[in-house]
Each structure stands twice: as C-alpha cells, then as structure tokens.
Amino acid sequence: MINHLMSILISIFLSGYHGKTTDFAKNSSCHRTTIAHFLNSGKWDDTLLENTLKSSVVEIIYSEAQRTGNPVFCIVDDTIASKPKPSSQALHPIEDAYFHQSHLKGKQDYGHQAVAVMLSCNGIVLNYAFVLYNKSISKIDIVQSIAKELPEPPVMSYFLCDCWYVSEKIINTFVQKGFHTIGALKTNRLLYPSGMKKKLSELDAELSVTEKGFDPVTVKNRKYYVCRWTIGVFFRQCKTRLALDTYQIRSSKGIQRYWLLMSMAHYICVIGTGRYQSFQEGYQLIRSTIQQEKYQYLFQCAKSSIDFEAFMKLAG
C-alpha cells in the first residue's frame, strides 16, 4: 500500500504529469493495471486516511487561531472536473459523470462535480474535504453534513460562500458550531425585516437612501469576504498541477480515492517542508528536490558504473 501511495504522490511532482495510471507506473515496479486496481478496488482503508488528514487540518488551523486570535474561515464552493463526453457505444463509461451547468464556461459541462471545503486562518489555507456530488444527495446537505462534523473553533469564525449555499439550513447549522455566515445573496431573494416581506433589491434601495454609508456587501471593509477567493485559487491549482481535469480513472471509488491523494499532495506542499508556505512555493520546492536527488543518483551511477539498469530507467 505504502509503495503505491508513494508512486502516485511522487509522480505528481514530475514533468508531464496528467493523472494517468501510466504516470503512476513510471515510479513503481508494478504494472499500471496493478496501481489502477489499488485505486479502484484495492483493500485499504481510505476512510482512515481521510479522517487522519481532516484531523490534522483542523489541528493546524484551530491552533493558529488560538495562537493569533484571528478567525477561522470555512470556505465552500464547487467546481467541475471536465471529462470527454462518452460515446453512445461506450461499454464502460466513467462513473458518476454528468452534465453540470458551468458558470465559468457559461454552458453545460460534462464531468464530475466536486464540493470543496477549505479551512483557513492567518494566511494558512488547507483543504478539509473534497466531496463527489453525484445527485444522490444535494450540495446543501453535503455542506450541512460537513458543518456538523467540524469542532467549534476557539475564536469567533466565519463561513464564507456564494449565493448558492446561503440557505437557512446551512446558516443555522454553522452558527451552532460557532461560524457566522458571510455570503452573497441573489437580488431576488425574499427577506422579512420587521416581519414585512421584501425583495433584497427593494431593501437595498430603501437602506441606501435612509442609512448613511450603507453597503450590503461590506463586512470588515470586505476584508473577510475576499478570503473566499482562495478556494478559486485552490481549484486552479488542482487543475493545472494536480490533474483534476485530466485524470483517467473510471470507477467512482477510484476517483474519490484519487481526490483524497490530491488533497494529501496539497497538504504536503503547504505544511510538509518544515514551514507553512503557499501551495505553489511548496510544490516548486518538492519538485526541485526530487529532480536534484534524481540527478545526484544518475551522477553516482555513472561515476561508479554500477546498477546500469536503474541508470537507464532514470535517464529515460
């Protein structure tokens, strides 16, 4: 199990990585089908790894909040891992892939939709959950379930989201856990100030006239809400560096296991090099270290003229 995990994690930091089983096999003595079996149906406890990763993320973020007094931000959004539309004759299409409305592309996009939850404090941003949305449970229920499992933070904290996740159910669940919601609202949303039904656009117009300096989106001069943008950066990193758009795994279980290892790679980049740093800094450091060790081994092989088979494998 450890050898397969390491083969996958190391391959992430090598040139030409696309999340394919052939990429994983380049760093393993096993055939690519063996590694595919490990992801799709291998008997290993991915739930234990997931819970361990979640506990570590909570410990790091909550400890930072306790140390600095800064709020914890729980940030939620979703994205689509785009995949090619399958042929009508496909015998084994990718599981749990559907058409979803892409706001980024402005059209329907085929692939897997993921709901991501990030925890952040004082500039440290870590992925807490990356959940496959397969239409068997609503995204609102997914987020509510995650909110229920979070421990109460040591300081006043905030749940940041866009208008899709601003619902009574989610707001109430998060406030019970010590998180106040800061989120976007659709202008046609109905509110009941003083028991009177009003559209948000109407209330905004009234308060803009009656309340000096009223701004419906101002919270700490917008300093808190802009922290939500880090999840967009995370999605972009997953797609450009961690092969979220290009992995080739067919089974639903294999996909969720791959996403777990993708989150683990992000975690390693941020905290695994001996100090907290951005994902990009950690990624470049680990990648350059792997390359340096590879070239050092190549040099030693050439110098001593031993292990020629290993030398040729690395050189190729």
Segments and roles (model prediction):
Residues L244-F299:
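Basic, amphipathic alpha-helical segments enriched in Lys/Arg and hydrophobic/aromatic residues
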Residues S11, S41-N122:
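Active-site-proximal, Lys/Arg-enriched surface segment
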Residues M1-L49, L53:
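Gly/serine-rich nucleotide phosphate-binding loop at the start of the catalytic core
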Residues F24-A25, N70-P84, V117, F159-V166, ...:
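Short, conserved catalytic/metal-binding motifs centered on acidic residues
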Residues I80, R222-I249:
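Short amphipathic alpha-helical "interface-anchor" segments enriched in bulky aromatics
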Residues M1-H4, L104-Y110, Q248-W259:
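Structural motif
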Residues Q292-G316:
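Charge-biased C-terminal accessory regions appended to nucleic-acid-, cytoskeletal NTPase
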Residues F130-V226, E281-I286, M312-L314:
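An internal, acidic/charged active-site-proximal segment
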